């Protein structure tokens, strides 16, 4: 398989790198990094949603099913990041 760069993800990662260089407070940095990770997750979620719709439209339920499993993993990761942020990291960053 050929590796393809994604300019959108590259931009999110570049932004995260810029923010991490600007933030000195460790707790604030942790919150910012979680926000960046969630930006990546949200992008991936939208892409999987689109790919699933296309696969279904093309009659490829086999592909749609595999993509749906990946989508569920991305959504679970996003929920975990939200839980971490809301239960601890954001509170510490606000202090």
Q: Could you describe each region identified by the protein language model?
A:
Residues 77-85:
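Amphipathic alpha-helical coiled-coil segments
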Residues 7-61:
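Acidic/histidine-rich alpha-helical segments that form the ligand environment
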Residues 3, 61-65:
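Short, solvent-exposed positions on alpha-helices
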